[in-house]
């Protein structure tokens, strides 16, 4: 378990302010640690970790008069260092350079007024502040988690940067007399200083995390993967099942990572980053984070650094913790199902639901595959990459430089970290296959009515008719699907939170605020009339199901909603139908379509490895490039960069995605670069575009964002279409349509009509912005001047017959054919404008030739007009 004082002197071997002044930075660490009564010591642990870390950042400093070039805020040469510039931060993916403008401005001003001693005086005050904050956080952790050193350390790790930022901001306002906004920027820059000012692609906290993680005996990279994912999620009949599936998978990964955190600390988790992670904050540190906990945001794969001698024990403990959690969840689900009439058996018969055949399904459903490889063992780096089939010309150039720096080709494995991750992935996938192959057969019997995969509870004991009669809605469930149904209840009991939209109908009715408008005018009357038909239709003065807003539901299918089968008054039902139809005439028919949005970062595996990140020279501070030997080779990633990217993805998924979706729909999953959301049709494109925009940013208020490309699939589908098939089609749009476009960064949008007609268009993200601001959009929505469905229909019907060399002329002909203004002059102007806009839009449509692009654009326009996507 964690020794908190040992953790701190390893972790704070460098001060958070290191980049302010490189010289004597270790002395500042001593002062900070002394505030917590911890003695600074550069032990073998620290030396080992620092040495391993340096293996991954390989360039050779050229000396100048036996001095080293230095980049810090001291602003002058001193001792063995000669100053070449102020620090910057280089984004680990986009390589965008960010300056520390507020710090520069303040330090320049102070130096000009008070001379060189100003920086040293400033550092004295800052070091004291860092020590005071550490002492405060240390005491808070000790008081909150008495005798629990693992949790004490986790609390310090999480909140020291947070509290330090708050302290620096107050310091900037009170001591430096900065205004609120400038003080906020000052603090943001201070807590995001680079770890290495020469190679500034990761922050100081990333370096401190990695050094602490590498300080264990025989540091070993461990990979965790939980499967199945898509089949488990896809086997969802209801939106609530879908949410429960995704959230439960995140909970299982949290349980796995909990073992790592207990034993070593949260900084040992490389991916996903646990800093600010809602599951970590809520379930490990007991923080009150509100409904943030309702978003599934932990992936099914993780990487961590552990001690090699502990790896086997960790594997056993992770598997046991997940297994025990699922079994306990199932036992609670059985109690809930019996008590709430989900399954109609006496309490005395409940034990039969806990027999071994059903428990075995729970134990064996998920495969938790864990593999590991030592980072510190030495091997011939050429041989390792050759054996793994990963050696190409770019890799060989990169290895050659590593060999030159260390004067040996036999190096610690961490030197080839990105290739090691690939090797570990390959080993892990092989192990997954082997372990899933070993699963035993289930008893013969009737299958679950939701997943169709597992034996239904009592499916081996009753004939089909009697089996159905035991279950609510005649829907027999297997142990895993029963867990899904119970899981929202369990989460609410642990967090006090409940998801807002339980069905796709809830989301569909958000379209143009239809439900809000209806409820304000007719809601009370509808509830009253529904209660007259049956009390089963009303609970807490609300309709029990949102599909009761549709007159078609009242005309057929009411019996399924009755708890007790009984005759209903058809006249009363007719009154409800007539009431609804009258309301529709006033405010319009209720929306029947909703959108599924799935998104995924492009080539993220290659981003993590560094294969698509350009040359090494792009990672080095511009002012120091004349003083270092830079290999002419691709930049291959480092553990530091992996941690930095992990944090950027966490910032994106935890903060930005949630902020964009807000109350627009239901955010099911936002983990790393993946997003799954259910949205009303009129918000789907807007939300998708905003999320892509956030993903493409490198920085937001000082915090890292991915700064990369993202592709998406949007399926617009009728609320009665089977959810599992809609999910499959949405993922097909992403994985087999958008992701197959060269260069990607593509949106594949599809409209699946109730009739079965299916329309698909592939476009670039900028098309959404261009179209939204176009005259064409206005005319399509107004349906004036002939610009409408007729125009779209004629182009789509005839485009495949157009001559390949006459596309522009045919487009002009169709515009002239369909566009009319109020007079000759307006008609001419309108035709020219719309033709020009169509040409602009075609620049953002994916296709192999002009005909494909025209078809793609007009299919997009058909989807827009038919589904009324834009408000």
Swiss-Prot record:
Known partners and oligomeric status? Part of the type III-B Cmr ribonucleoprotein (RNP) complex, an elongated RNP with Cmr2 and Cmr3 as the base, with Cmr4 and Cmr5 forming a helical core along the mature crRNA (39 or 45 nt in length), while the complex is capped by Cmr6 and Cmr1. The 5' end of the crRNA is bound to Cmr2 and Cmr3, while Cmr6 and a Cmr1 subunit (Cmr1-1 or Cmr1-2) cap the 3' end of the crRNA.
Q: What is this protein called?
A: CRISPR system Cmr subunit Cmr2
Q: Which organism is it from?
A: Pyrococcus furiosus (strain ATCC 43587 / DSM 3638 / JCM 8422 / Vc1)
Gene behind this chain? cmr2
Residue numbers spanned by region Not required for target RNA cleavage: 1-215
Keyword set includes Amino-acid biosynthesis: no
Alphabetical GO biological process terms: defense response to virus
Binding residue positions for Mn(2+) 4: 656, 694, 700
Entry's cofactor comment: Binds 2 Ca(2+) per subunit, this may not be the physiological cation. Binds 4 Mn(2+) per subunit.
